[in-house]
C-alpha cells in the first residue's frame, strides 16, 4: 500500500513538472541590465527597456509592428537607440519625462513664423528647458523669425505649440463690446521721425500715422446689405397664365456684411513710443484687422553700409588715368570698365581709390572727405557739410537777418532688388563760394557769389562694385606761400626769404559711393583690435613681471577708492 502511495506521488510530481510552462520561449526574462530578444516586437523590447531605465517608453503602432532579435545591453541607452534607429528605420525623442519611438515614415515637418520673439531667443528657451534635440535643429533666418522644423510628431507639435505660446501677444482688454489691443513693433518705428535737411523739415511717417491716413473717411455707417434695388412687381397675365417670379439680386448675409464693414467705424489708434507699441481701441474685428495690417508692415530690414569718397583731381591727371565718361576707364592691366554716356558709372572702387591714393602722395589729387554711413534699406542716409553766411535786410521800418547755406550734401536712399543688387536713389548738391578772394574793393555788406551743382539720379550697383558720380569741372585758384626755414620769419628782412605762387587749374570733382550689405556682426573696436594684435605678437605676456606689478598696483588703487 505504501509502495502504491509513493509511486502515485512521484507520478504527480512528474506531471506537474511537465505541465508548468517554461520562461525561455514566451516570456524571456531580463538578465541583469540587458535583454535577450528572439523575434519579439519592438513594444516588448521597449517595455523591458522602460523597466530598466525607470522611464516610460511610448511606441507608435507602426513602430510596434517591427520585430527584433539579439542580445542588448541597456547601460548606454542613447547609443543603443541611435544604433536601433539606423538599423530599423526609427526616430525617437526624449522630453525629460518619456521616450517616444516612431517609424521613420511618421516624420513630420512644419514652418513657423515668429513676430515677437527672435529665433535665437526661442532656441535658447528650448535649450534651457531641456526640450532641444540636436538631431532635429531649427533651420531658419534670425532676421525674419521664420524657421523650419522636422522630426518626430511629438517633437514637432511641442515646438509649434511652444512657439505659438511664446510669440502670442496679449489678447487685450475687454471693455464691453470694445476691445483695446497692444501691438509691439520690432522692426520699425511707431511714431513719426523728423530730421532737418538744410532749411527743410523732413518727416517720415510712422506706423500710427500711416494707418490713421489709411482709415481716414472710413467712419461711415453700415452699408446696404442688398446689392441692388428690388425690381418692380411684374404685371399679371390677362389669360390666366402664371407670371414668372422676379429676379431678385442675391444680397449678402448679415454676417458677411458685418465682416466687410469691420474695418470701418470709429477706431482709435495711439502711438506709444516708450515701448514702440501701438494702442488700438475698437471692436474685436477691428483690433484683429489692425493687428494683421501691422504684421504685414512690420518687417525686418537689411543693413547697408555706405562708404563715400569725395575726390578732387586735376583734369589732366584724370585724363592720364584713362577716364572718359563717354568711353572707358583703364588703369594698366588691372582695371577696365565701360562707362555710359553720362556722368555716372559703376566700377571696382578699391582699385580706383588705390590709383587716387597714388596721385595724392604726389599731391596731384585730394581726398576732400571720406565719411562712412550705416543705414537700413528704404531709410535715407544724409551727409551734409555746409557753410552759412548771414546778411542784413534793411527796410524802411523793419530789419531782418537772412542766411544762405551752401556746401556738399549727399542723400542716399538704398533698397535691394530681387536679384540682390543695391539700387540707390541719389541726390547730390555741391556748392562753393565763387567770390574772388583778391577783390579788395568789395564792401563788407556785399553778398558772396555761390555756385551750386545738382545731381539727382537712380542707379543699381552690382554686388562688390561701386558707383562713380560726377566728373564736372570747376576752376580752382590756389595761393601758395613758401619760405626758407627760420630766415623767413625774421622781422623786416624775412620777406626777402619768402616767395608766393599762384596756380590756376581745372579741378574735376568725383563722388564714389560703395554700398555694402552688412550680414556679419560688426567688427571689434580699436582697443580690442590692438589687444588682439599685442597678444598674437607676444608683446602682451601674462608672465611679464612689470605688467603683473602694474596690474596689482592698479587693483590696490581701486580697493583704496572703494
From Swiss-Prot:
GO molecular function term, any single one: identical protein binding
Q: Which domain of life is it from?
A: Bacteria
Consequence of gene loss (knockout): Insertion mutants are hypoinvasive in the HEp-2 cell assay.
Give start-end of the signal peptide.
1-24
Keyword Transcription assigned = no
Where does the record place it? Answer: Cell outer membrane
Q: Main subcellular localization, coarse class?
A: membrane
Pfam families named in the record: Secretin, Secretin_N, T3S_SPI-1_N0
Q: List the GO terms this entry assigns under cellular component, sorted alphabetically.
A: cell outer membrane; type II protein secretion system complex; type III protein secretion system complex
Q: Name one GO biological process term.
A: protein secretion
Q: Which UniProt keywords apply?
A: Cell outer membrane, Membrane, Protein transport, Signal, Translocation, Transport, Virulence
List the PANTHER family hit by this protein, alphabetically: PROBABLE GENERAL SECRETION PATHWAY PROTEIN D, SPI-1 TYPE 3 SECRETION SYSTEM SECRETIN
**Assembly information from the UniProt record:** The core secretion machinery of the T3SS is composed of approximately 20 different proteins, including cytoplasmic components, a base, an export apparatus and a needle. This subunit is part of the base, which anchors the injectisome in the bacterial cell envelope. Forms a stable homooligomeric complex. The complex is composed of 15 subunits.
Membership in a protein family: Belongs to the bacterial secretin family. T3SS SctC subfamily.
Q: What does this protein do?
A: Component of the type III secretion system (T3SS), also called injectisome, which is used to inject bacterial effector proteins into eukaryotic host cells. Forms a ring-shaped multimeric structure with an apparent central pore in the outer membrane.
Q: What is this protein called?
A: SPI-1 type 3 secretion system secretin
What organism does the UniProt record list as the source?
Salmonella typhimurium (strain LT2 / SGSC1412 / ATCC 700720)
Amino acid at each position: 500500500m505504501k509502495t502504491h502511495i509513493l509511486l502515485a506521488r512521484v507520478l504527480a510530481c512528474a506531471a506537474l513538472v511537465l505541465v508548468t510552462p517554461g520562461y525561455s520561449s514566451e516570456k524571456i526574462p531580463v538578465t541583469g541590465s540587458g535583454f535577450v530578444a528572439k523575434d519579439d516586437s519592438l513594444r516588448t523590447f521597449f517595455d523591458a527597456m522602460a523597466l530598466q531605465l525607470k522611464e516610460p517608453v511610448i511606441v507608435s503602432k507602426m513602430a510596434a509592428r517591427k520585430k527584433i532579435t539579439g542580445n542588448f545591453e541597456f547601460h548606454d541607452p542613447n547609443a543603443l537607440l541611435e544604433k536601433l534607429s539606423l538599423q530599423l528605420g526609427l526616430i525617437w525623442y526624449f522630453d525629460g519625462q518619456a521616450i517616444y519611438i516612431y517609424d521613420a515614415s511618421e516624420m513630420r515637418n512644419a514652418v513657423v513664423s515668429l513676430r515677437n520673439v527672435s529665433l535665437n531667443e526661442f532656441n535658447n528657451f528650448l535649450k534651457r528647458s531641456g526640450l532641444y534635440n540636436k538631431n532635429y535643429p531649427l533651420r531658419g533666418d534670425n532676421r525674419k523669425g521664420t524657421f523650419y522644423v522636422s522630426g518626430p510628431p511629438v517633437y514637432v507639435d511641442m515646438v509649434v505649440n511652444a512657439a505659438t505660446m511664446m510669440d502670442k501677444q496679449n489678447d487685450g482688454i475687454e471693455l464691453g463690446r470694445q476691445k483695446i489691443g497692444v501691438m509691439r513693433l520690432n522692426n520699425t518705428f511707431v511714431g513719426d521721425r523728423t530730421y532737418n535737411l538744410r532749411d527743410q523739415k523732413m518727416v517720415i511717417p510712422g506706423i500710427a500715422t500711416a494707418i490713421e491716413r489709411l482709415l481716414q473717411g472710413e467712419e461711415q455707417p453700415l452699408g446696404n446689405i442688398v446689392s441692388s434695388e428690388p425690381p418692380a412687381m411684374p404685371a399679371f397675365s390677362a389669360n390666366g397664365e402664371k407670371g414668372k417670379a422676379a429676379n431678385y439680386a442675391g444680397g449678402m448675409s448679415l454676417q458677411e456684411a458685418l465682416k466687410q464693414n469691420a474695418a470701418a467705424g470709429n477706431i482709435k489708434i495711439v502711438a506709444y513710443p516708450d515701448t514702440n507699441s501701438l494702442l488700438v481701441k475698437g471692436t474685436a474685428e477691428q483690433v484683429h484687422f489692425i493687428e494683421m495690417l501691422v504684421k504685414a508692415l512690420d518687417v525686418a530690414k537689411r543693413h547697408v553700409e555706405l562708404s563715400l569718397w569725395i575726390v578732387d583731381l586735376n583734369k589732366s591727371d584724370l585724363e592720364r588715368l584713362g577716364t572718359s565718361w563717354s568711353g572707358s576707364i583703364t588703369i594698366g592691366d588691372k582695371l577696365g570698365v565701360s562707362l555710359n554716356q553720362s556722368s555716372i558709372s559703376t566700377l571696382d572702387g578699391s582699385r580706383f581709390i588705390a590709383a587716387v591714393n597714388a596721385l595724392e602722395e604726389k599731391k596731384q589729387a585730394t581726398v576732400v572727405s571720406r565719411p562712412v554711413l550705416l543705414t537700413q534699406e528704404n531709410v535715407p542716409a544724409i551727409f551734409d557739410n555746409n557753410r552759412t553766411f548771414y546778411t542784413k535786410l534793411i527796410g524802411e521800418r523793419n530789419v531782418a537777418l537772412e542766411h544762405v547755406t551752401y556746401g556738399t550734401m549727399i542723400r542716399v536712399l538704398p533698397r535691394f532688388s530681387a536679384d540682390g543688387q543695391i539700387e540707390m536713389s541719389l541726390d547730390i548738391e555741391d556748392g562753393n563760394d565763387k567770390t574772388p578772394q583778391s577783390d579788395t574793393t568789395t564792401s563788407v555788406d556785399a553778398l558772396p557769389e555761390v555756385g551750386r551743382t545738382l545731381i539727382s539720379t537712380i542707379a543699381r550697383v552690382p554686388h562688390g562694385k561701386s558707383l562713380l558720380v560726377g566728373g564736372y569741372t570747376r576752376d580752382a585758384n590756389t595761393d601758395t606761400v613758401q619760405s626758407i626755414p627760420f630766415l623767413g620769419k625774421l622781422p623786416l628782412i624775412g620777406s626777402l626769404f619768402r616767395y608766393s605762387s599762384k596756380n590756376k587749374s581745372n579741378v574735376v570733382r568725383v563722388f564714389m559711393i560703395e554700398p555694402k550689405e552688412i550680414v556679419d556682426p560688426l567688427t571689434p573696436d580699436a582697443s580690442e583690435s590692438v589687444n588682439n594684435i599685442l597678444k598674437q605678437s607676444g608683446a602682451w605676456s601674462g608672465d611679464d613681471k612689470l605688467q603683473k606689478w602694474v596690474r596689482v598696483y592698479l587693483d590696490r588703487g581701486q580697493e583704496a577708492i572703494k
